Amino acid sequence: SAVDLLAATGVRGLRLKKEAGIERVYVNDASSTAFALMKQNAKLNKLKLFISNLRAHEFLAVRHKAKDKKFGYVDIDPFGTPVPFLDAGVKAIVENRGGIIAVTATDTSALCGTYPDACLRKYGAKPLYTYLMNEAGLRILIKKVQEVAAQYDIALTPLFAHTTRHYMRCFLQAARGADKADKILQQIGCFQGAGPMWLGKLWDEPLVEKMFRLTF
């Protein structure tokens, strides 16, 4: 199953259902306008989605009471920083079967060093304001998500990550275990006056090669 916690029009959920063939897809948004659009778009595409009109935390709180309360894929794509949604988000992943969490950040002015104090407050790291700022910001974002997950003995390994125009996005695969989480944290450090940030690989090479072959 998959959930898009801040789904807006629901297009990502529709694609997960139609293109990826995921059986149970949940789309949620606190906006009543978005809720109406999600229902309309699902109807136009003749697809069954589980559509809700709740705040992200409320949705996860309700789901926590359900038998199948966790998801194989959790998508967090807010306007601005994803930090307020990370704690509930990582706890919603099916961590013992390789669940994936996708996180987007659009507050690139903080992550890329224009507002370093904001980056320090939100992400607990000092950014770079140089030609390396995009990669450094992406690594700071990944670090933040990993730290939140590690509190619950969940290790998050990057599958794919990128920066594009006004946003940064990362896909991280979960594994249960304190030892595994510790190994992830050991790959977090500082770099020439910036950090702490994720110092490991930004993507899984075999996966990216396969993506490239399928695309081109």
Where are these regions (language model features)?
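SAM-dependent transferase fold signal centered on methyltransferase-like domains
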Residues: 1-216
